Every structure is written in structure tokens, then in C-alpha cells.
A protein has these predicted regions:
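Short hydrophobic beta-strand segments
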Residues: 2-6, 159-162
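Active-site helix-to-loop segments that bind/position phosphate- or nucleotide-bearing substrates
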Residues: 4-89
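Internal, well-folded beta-alpha domain core
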Residues: 87-242, 247-250
Length: 250
């Protein structure tokens, strides 16, 4: 199985571990970063749709992009999913498995393996640059990433565990992905007092990270083994959903 997980906007500035691999699209990321570094703070704030404070932080990051110390991607992000993935406490065996089976989706680097070296940055799907042929960045990546993802899954067992988000599906020709490989997308719901099921963003992100950790620690081989996942009251509900969308309910 191959696993897909989204990156996070919040990033650590340092990591204790050194990366062991280079991003597949490092040269593309370099070109994008160089163009971002040519903008002033106001232009960055507009492109990234963020505050002046965040724009200033990332203006500095892009100016230091080529010389900043790299850290492994899986240890660089600090969003909700990554807080529950707790990558810093994974064993060497789990990290070795992750390096072969986990892809991290990313608007700047495209696709990352967990131990690829990256530097702190911020990038949004709507950014358009000369380097992207003036296309929004998610459209720019589509032709580059679709075959990479499909080929990596086919070279494994033909199954993709989709724990990324809908926003990052636009990095790929997602219709083609679903036609050529088997996509399993776990869904996480909280049962309301009236019995209705509701997806809550914070819980969904937390569970995605925790499920990645579960897969890595147990080195799962089949999607059926996901049924053993339980976390913070979420349990597999076999009576709900279908095989492609296993439901986990709290």
C-alpha cells in the first residue's frame, strides 16, 4: 500500500534528525522559491492570502531558501495531523517503512517522501507565477504528479490509502487516479446526540495523523487491517459506508 497525507501550514524551524533523501522535484521547488523571493512583503501577503506578519516570516524564509538547514519532511510539519502522527517518536523500522510507503502532498515540493530534506516555507494552491506558466500552482503540478503517484502505487500493490484532503486532490488528475488504482479513503465521524454522524475537522485531522502512525508502526499490508485502528474513542463501524470509504465513528 501507498499512503497519501497532506502537509501542514505550521512548521518547525529545527529538527534533531538529518534528512536522507532529496525531494523528487527539488529543482522545481527551487525555481518557485526564487520567484517568491523576488516579491516584497505586500506582494507575498496578497499571493499567500495571509497577514503581513506571516508574509514577513515567509519573505525571510524564501530569501534563505537555498542556504537554510534542511530537515526531514515528516518532522518539519506541526499541524493537527502531525501532532497525532508524533513522527519524532517513530522507530527506525517505522521510518524505513514510511520512506517506502508514505507520500506527503505539498504545493511547493509537489510530492515528498518522509525523509526528504525540506526547509520551512508557505505556499498556497492559488499562487500563480511565471514558473507555473501563470497557472494556479495546483494546476501546474497536475501533469507532473499524476503519473508519479499512479506509477508508485502500481509498483506496490495497486492500493492507495487516501489520508490527505480534498484540497490536495487537485494536485492530480484525480479522476484518472481513481480509474487506474484502488483508492481507499477512511472517513472519521462523531455521532451526535440525535444519532446523526458529523465530520469535525479537528477530529478528522487528528485521526488521519494517528492512522498514519498506526499503519507505519504495524507495517500494514492490506486495507482490511485498518479495521483494527482505534483512537480517542473512534472505532471501525463495518455496518456503515463501503469498502472504499471505511467509516470510523466516535
Amino acid at each position: 500500500m501507498q499512503i497519501l497525507l497532506a502537509n501542514a501550514k505550521i512548521m518547525f524551524e529545527k529538527a534533531d534528525r538529518k534528512p536522507i533523501s532529496v525531494p523528487l522535484f527539488q529543482s522545481v521547488a527551487n525555481d518557485l522559491a526564487k520567484e517568491m523571493a523576488m516579491m516584497n512583503v505586500e506582494e507575498l501577503a496578497k499571493q499567500l492570502d495571509c497577514s503581513s506578519k506571516i508574509a514577513m516570516t515567509n519573505w525571510k524564509r524564501y530569501h534563505d531558501f537555498m542556504v537554510a538547514e534542511k530537515r526531514p519532511a515528516i518532522l518539519a510539519y506541526n499541524g493537527q495531523a502531525y501532532k497525532h502522527l508524533r513522527a519524532s517518536s517513530l522507530s527506525e523500522e517505522s521510518l524505513e517503512y514510511a520512506q517506502k510507503h508514505l507520500w506527503i502532498t505539498c504545493f511547493l515540493y509537489g510530492l515528498l517522501r518522509p525523509l526528504d530534506g525540506i526547509v520551512p516555507y508557505r505556499m498556497e494552491h492559488c499562487v500563480s507565477l511565471e514558473a507555473t506558466n501563470d497557472k494556479p500552482i495546483n494546476q501546474f503540478w497536475k501533469d507532473k504528479l499524476t503519473d508519479v503517484l499512479i506509477d508508485s502505487v502500481k509498483a506496490d500493490d495497486g492500493i492507495l490509502i487516501h489520508l490527505s484532503t480534498e484540497e490536495y486532490e487537485h494536485l492530480f488528475d484525480w479522476k484518472r487516479v481513481c480509474q487506474e488504482i484502488k483508492v481507499i479513503q477512511p472517513l472519521f465521524y462523531v455521532r451526535q446526540k440525535d444519532g446523526r454522524l458529523k465530520m469535525q475537522a479537528v477530529w478528522a485531522k487528528s485521526c488521519r495523523g494517528a492512522m498514519v502512525r498506526y499503519i507505519l508502526n504495524n507495517q500494514l499490508l492490506t486495507p482490511e487491517e485498518l479495521a483494527g485502528f482505534s483512537y480517542e474513542g473512534f472505532e471501525y463501524a463495518p455496518e456503515l459506508g463501503e469498502a472504499a470509504f471505511p467509516h470510523f465513528v466516535r
